[in-house]
Amino acid sequence: MKFPADYHYTSPFRSCKYSNILHFISLLLIFSRVGLPNYIFIFLINKAANKEHRVETLLSGNSANACKLFNILKSFQHLFFFFQICTIFSISIKLVLLKSQEYGRIPAEFSIIRSEKKKKEEQ
């Protein structure tokens, strides 16, 4: 598929009213170290959401592949947004459980991370 020389695509997130939240969550995912594949995916989303970039810059000048990637991002944007929300939610649950264990609100047996005392006792 060929694009006219002056064609600038519209971002899949430009019409989404949650675009700022999506970028914030993307940054949180990068800093929470959820893995390299997610980092690459977030990089592609941020490239696609940037209004100044052309479609051809997403994948090394191959406009047919860039158009496919753009269509995939556009059709699955809400699904990806849902998965990012789920990831942030699970990270926050783990942090709450960890803090609850530190203050003695829940027993160590039910916590995600064992306390240092328990590790020393087992050794």
UniProtKB/Swiss-Prot annotation:
A Gene Ontology term for the protein's cellular component: membrane
Subcellular location as annotated: Membrane
Record keywords: Membrane, Transmembrane, Transmembrane helix
Transmembrane parts of this sequence: 25-45, 78-98
Major place of residence: membrane
Membrane topology per record: Multi-pass membrane protein
Superkingdom to which the source organism belongs: Eukaryota
Protein name: Uncharacterized protein YBR292C
Organism: Saccharomyces cerevisiae (strain ATCC 204508 / S288c)
Origin organism lineage: Eukaryota, Fungi, Dikarya, Ascomycota, Saccharomycotina
